[in-house]
Amino acid sequence: MASSLLAGERLVRALGPGGELEREQLPRKLRAQLEAALGKKHAGSDNATGPRRLVSFRLIRDLHQHLRERNSRLYLHELLEGSDIYFPEIVKPPRNPELVARLEKIKIQLANEEYKRITRNVTCQDAQCGGTLSDLGKQVRSVKALVVTIFNFIITVAAAFVCTYLGSQYVFTEMASRVLAALIVASVVGLAELYVMVRAMEGELGEL
């Protein structure tokens, strides 16, 4: 976290002999602290202009407060021209080898569990697909048997009607009587065939 400023040349000159801050009658303690901060140079390899002068925010606040109390025409932002906020380099602590190894182990376990979960879903889907195909084959065979049964039912009823109609000509002379007799016989045969067909379908559904 930033807590200091990299003092610019403007602030250094203002605090020096004959500088702008000389006539502001800075408190002795504040001047001494500022001179100590600006006189203490901090080496830094990332600074191309040479050693760095660091001034804490607390000293900057004290300086600002003093200037405001004196109603000075010298403003803080003018003194801070060329200054920058100093961000200290964050030193990362060394990682614990045991902790790193434990984290890697946990990552591997989580990856294995995720892989097993994915492959388990795929296996279940394959099994369901195989079961669906098997059930589909049974359903096709059942539908085929049902179609054959219905076809036989229609043929049987039609044959009963035709045979009765042709045979009743020796008993009835009127066509209406012959048709009625043929319908009665065909209905009886149809009901019998329907009963047998329903029982057969119940047996097949029970097997499914």
From Swiss-Prot:
Record function comment: Accessory component of the proton-transporting vacuolar (V)-ATPase protein pump involved in intracellular iron homeostasis. In aerobic conditions, required for intracellular iron homeostasis, thus triggering the activity of Fe(2+) prolyl hydroxylase (PHD) enzymes, and leading to HIF1A hydroxylation and subsequent proteasomal degradation. Necessary for endolysosomal acidification and lysosomal degradation. May be involved in Golgi homeostasis. Binds 20(S)-hydroxycholesterol (20(S)-OHC).
This protein's UniProt keywords: Acetylation, Cytoplasmic vesicle, Endoplasmic reticulum, Membrane, Transmembrane, Transmembrane helix
Protein's UniProt keywords contain Flavoprotein: no
Upper lineage: Eukaryota, Metazoa, Chordata, Craniata, Vertebrata
PANTHER family cross-referenced by the UniProt entry: TRANSMEMBRANE PROTEIN 199 (PTHR31394:SF1)
Bridged cysteine pairs (disulfide): none
Protein name per UniProt: Vacuolar ATPase assembly protein VMA12
GO molecular function, one term: oxysterol binding
UniProt xrefs under Pfam families: Vma12 (PF11712)
Top-level taxonomic group: Eukaryota
Main location: membrane
Membrane topology per record: Multi-pass membrane protein
Subunit structure: Accessory component of the multisubunit proton-transporting vacuolar (V)-ATPase protein pump.
Bilayer-spanning residue ranges: 146-166, 179-199
GO CC annotation terms, alphabetical: COPI-coated vesicle membrane; endoplasmic reticulum; endoplasmic reticulum membrane; endoplasmic reticulum-Golgi intermediate compartment membrane; lysosome; vacuolar proton-transporting V-type ATPase complex
Localization, UniProt: Cytoplasmic vesicle, COPI-coated vesicle membrane; Endoplasmic reticulum-Golgi intermediate compartment membrane; Endoplasmic reticulum membrane
N-acetylalanine, modified sites: A2
One example of a Gene Ontology biological process annotation: vacuolar proton-transporting V-type ATPase complex assembly
